[in-house]
Amino acid sequence: MTKAELVKELRIRTQASMSECIKALDASENDIEKAIVWLRENGAIKAANKLKNAATDGVVLAKKINNKAILIEVNCQTDFVAKNENFLAYANQILEEALAKVENKEDFDKLIINGKPIAESGLDLTAYIGEKIVFRRGEILKANDDQTLGVYTHNNNRVAAIILVDGKVEDEVVRNVAMHAAAMRPRYLNEKVVDKLWLAKEREIIVNQLEHEGKPAAFAAKIIDGRLNKILKENCLVDQSYFKQPELTIEKYLKNNNAVAVGYFSYEVGEGIEKAPQMSFADEVAAQMKK
């Protein structure tokens, strides 16, 4: 087997990172079995250093039980590890623990996973896999007896959403809205909760656009209001066109089912985290071999 093939085989068998596999093979004279032992012996020592790395991949998961819905994001460094069964088991363990213990957003940081605070709970897995593993964030929605919760996690675990509505409705209705929210990713539930600073920046952008377009000053105010209204409708969940029935807004779809949206959160893996440029597998191996 070539060195690249050995690296690939070792990575598949151990889920260790590319660089760690190369180091292990170099230290073991390209003997895969010895390299596996090397990884086990050296992993724990280097795990702490891995925590300095940027974890931009991972999964987002959503689930509800009784009157509680939980949304979490757990990060790793590559999509390869994001599909690893040990990583997925860890993420789901956090999800289940949150469903059992979390009552407000602050409780996420108090969770104990495998006997360790959640902030440290990924260290053992980091040592085993060779990538930074970390719980990033979580949200909770709770329903009273007259409300209904909806959750949706896409099958690739890359996007997910939770929603709370006033009214007792079928699970399919709220799941449809959660699915829509996960797909369309609106910034806000409705205009009442729109961030004023964000809105001011959007208005400023429109004003600058009009200056470049040379629009008549007499029509500027009307144009600004029109474009701003369009932006609000695109970014507020209740004002968006429902993807299954575009003639209806989400607000109208829920109203037709005797419900009103009152709470909403959605996550996408790695959003807001600066990502390094991606390399092909061959380029990554070549780069590591030069070190």
UniProtKB/Swiss-Prot annotation:
Keyword Protein biosynthesis part of the UniProt annotation: yes
Source organism, top-level taxon: Bacteria
GO molecular function, one term: translation elongation factor activity
Main location: cytoplasm
UniProtKB keywords: Cytoplasm, Elongation factor, Protein biosynthesis
Name of the protein described by the UniProt record: Elongation factor Ts
UniProt similarity note: Belongs to the EF-Ts family.
UniProt cross-references to HAMAP family, sorted A to Z: EF_Ts
InterPro entries, per the entry: EF-Ts_dimer_sf, Transl_elong_EFTs/EF1B, Transl_elong_EFTs/EF1B_dimer, Transl_elong_Ts_CS, UBA-like_sf
Entry-linked NCBIfam families: tsf (TIGR00116)
Pfam families: EF_TS
Gene field: tsf
Residue segments, region Involved in Mg(2+) ion dislocation from EF-Tu: 78-81
Subcellular location per the Swiss-Prot or TrEMBL entry: Cytoplasm
